[in-house]
């Protein structure tokens, strides 16, 4: 009797899929399976990390810096946190004021004696002979009784550089914890569970092993016992546990057999009886950016400068490197074609997919890294 009432057990799938039988998922499908992260969740963790500091005696509070690696969305999280706490946000000075050493911007630290958040310290200096005076003055003022309570956010590369050039007293530092393969799995499951097409089974394309453990309601129907792939362990290691890097690589790894022409009613009928299998490229088959054949020392300087400032517009980058803007733009286009940098809102940055290989190269060449 119960067998008649229960949905039929899904037919076993082949333990692997030839890549020719699969296709990369469309952006619309990827947005269903790996949606954009909700950084409001991160503000809860940040609040927990700062709880003791917030509750301490005001006279004993040291200035605080929250350091995050590239693509951790550190500044965005701090802006959300400031909004929740009703603290005012201090935007970075414009580059002309930094180079002119205009200290009027520092007055915001003492305005109204109200608490503040400075989300992007990396945009408050420039690696230039005239570009460090303002941030040195900022560090001096942090310990003044006139400065109201504040939290500073800083990219990890900029923080490494500032520690290198500043020998004075340093603030209290908190660093975002890197994601492990377990936390990546929990995160990816949460993102997928929010889809209208859930539940999903994530299996490695070349051997059929499960990349994410199946949902409990489906695990009991799987025969033979579930074997787990090592994909997430390699992803966590390669991405250095940086959520934005891991998220981009995860999206790139997914393949499917979806018929996106199905109507919503037909999709609901399909998912009434079985989960959708999303196939994951094996780690060795995952295509990652590589340096162009004509990669030059100038391009290495460009990448390093972009990382030290968490992104720059072309003209300012050219000014810092003492190169013609047209030449810098040509180099950026070459690096963009290789997948190493990206451009958005007139700002060039090292891309999430390119970051691991760029960091490894710069570290190997003896550049200052985070």
Q: Which sequence ranges carry the predicted segments?
A:
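A short, basic N-terminal segment
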Residues: 1-60, 363, 368-369
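Conserved P-loop NTPase "ATPase switch" module shared by AAA+ and STAND
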Residues: 90-135, 152-154
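Sensor-1/coupling segment of RecA-like P-loop NTPase cores
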Residues: 122-166, 173-184
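Conserved small helical "lid"/interfacial subdomain of P-loop NTPases
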Residues: 174-228, 237-238
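The conserved phosphate-sensing helix
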Residues: 224-251
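Winged-helix-like regulatory helical subdomains adjacent to P-loop NTPase cores
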Residues: 243, 248-327
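Short amphipathic alpha-helical interaction segments
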Residues: 322-338, 343, 353
